[in-house]
Amino acid sequence: GSIQLVGPMRQYLSCIGEVGLAIHRHRIRKCIYVESMMVNWLGMIKKKDVLPQIQKYVSEGMPRNWGLFECCVIAVDLSNKLAIKILEEWFLEFKNGAKRDQLSLTYIIWKNGFKPNTIGVLNPKGNVSNNSSIIWERGKKHMNELTKYKGE
């Protein structure tokens, strides 16, 4: 899909949390393990590509239902050293992992000892799909299936 920013982004500066980031919460799921199963089931990633990454997260103690972020729009305070650390580690995790930004960013935030509530929320009353400052054209192929299963 594609993202088009149609509203002022300045409004999101006040949303940035203590870690220096503000992100949309996932509109349906709150677990990277369920998300990994969904994207595999939908054919968006192969099991052989995501399984080692998920096994690593399990072995390190990443809890189920810890939270899940949608990474299509992120507000960042580039003067915040924590934000820079998270972004650098996220890049490496993404580069060396299954190329699923939602899984790797959520893991990196958890691995650094932060809680989901330390990350600012873009559109606190909703999510990316109902944010009036964003037009999000998702690929129609998977959209119906993605919204069916919450994984609870």
Predicted regions and their residues:
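Glycosyltransferase catalytic domains, chiefly GT-A lineage
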Residues: I3-E152
